[in-house]
A protein has these predicted regions:
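Surface-facing alpha-helical segments and adjacent helix-coil boundary elements at the starts of domains
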Residues: 1-239
Length: 239
């Protein structure tokens, strides 16, 4: 597989895609993106750059269609492009973007789809619009789909790592703690990831919930992730 490392080359492909779109329509644009980017080895940062550039000239009312077709290819890079474009739509279309992200996550049916889209859409929404996003995440926690529940932990990891305020980090910890009885391995990894990150960056939150964490009802896998996070906090402080 050809590897692409140049932003200049990405710009050239995008310019070709734009010209094809203007002259022949959306289908021609999608062919250029598929052949020029998705079938090549392109880093996630370069794909995010491409998504930002595309969002500048693809009209808002056509963007969802373009994302749907790209994601339908099931190429890993398509989820980065779609995730980034949905992220850019969050200020105006927060709920719609989260709903579409969840549809991509369920349809993708792979852990990496959950993590790629979850971080870029739900995680960024939590970081930038916590008061609006947290109620949506609480609602998603009731879903039966394992990927939707997993993405709550993924979103928490992303937002806390990016400096989500302690107030909202604590709210998210309570939500993760309520999911600590999970038995599915994919859910456990996502929820545990979020809990571990909170423990690393906000050990005081963990101490406030120590009694609940130590209850028999709280599974050992959850407590183990907390311990790992606290140990990483100690290591970071010692450096």
């Amino acid at each position: 597989m050809e590897k692409m490392t140049s932003k200049v080359r990405v710009r050239e492909i995008l310019e070709q895609a734009k010209q094809s779109w203007e002259q022949q329509g959306q289908d021609a644009l999608l062919v250029v993106i598929f052949e020029g980017l998705l079938k090549k080895k392109v880093s996630f940062p370069l794909l995010e750059f491409a998504a930002k550039e595309m969002a500048l000239w693809i009209p808002e009312d056509e963007q969802l269609y373009v994302m749907d077709i790209l994601v339908a290819t099931k190429e890993m890079g398509s989820y980065v492009l779609a995730g980034m474009m949905l992220q850019l739509r969050l200020p105006l279309y927060l709920e719609e973007s989260i709903q579409r992200a969840c549809a991509y996550i369920v349809g993708g049916d792979q852990w990496y789809v959950c993590d790629i889209v979850g971080e870029r859409v739900l995680g960024h929404a939590l970081l930038t619009y916590p008061e609006k996003t947290i109620p949506l995440l609480k609602h998603l926690a009731q879903y039966s789909d394992k990927w939707i529940v997993r993405t709550i932990g993924v979103a928490t990891h992303y937002a806390v790592k990016k400096d989500l305020s302690p107030k909202f980090a604590e709210t998210m910890f309570r939500l993760l703690l309520s999911l600590s009885d999970a038995t599915d391995s994919h859910i456990k990894k996502g929820i545990g990831w979020g809990a571990k990150t909170i423990a690393k960056f906000h050990p005081a939150i963990i101490e406030r919930y120590r009694k609940q964490i130590d209850l028999r009802e709280t599974k050992q896998w959850f407590r183990t992730k907390i311990t790992i996070g606290l140990n990483r906090n100690k290591v970071a402080k010692s450096l």
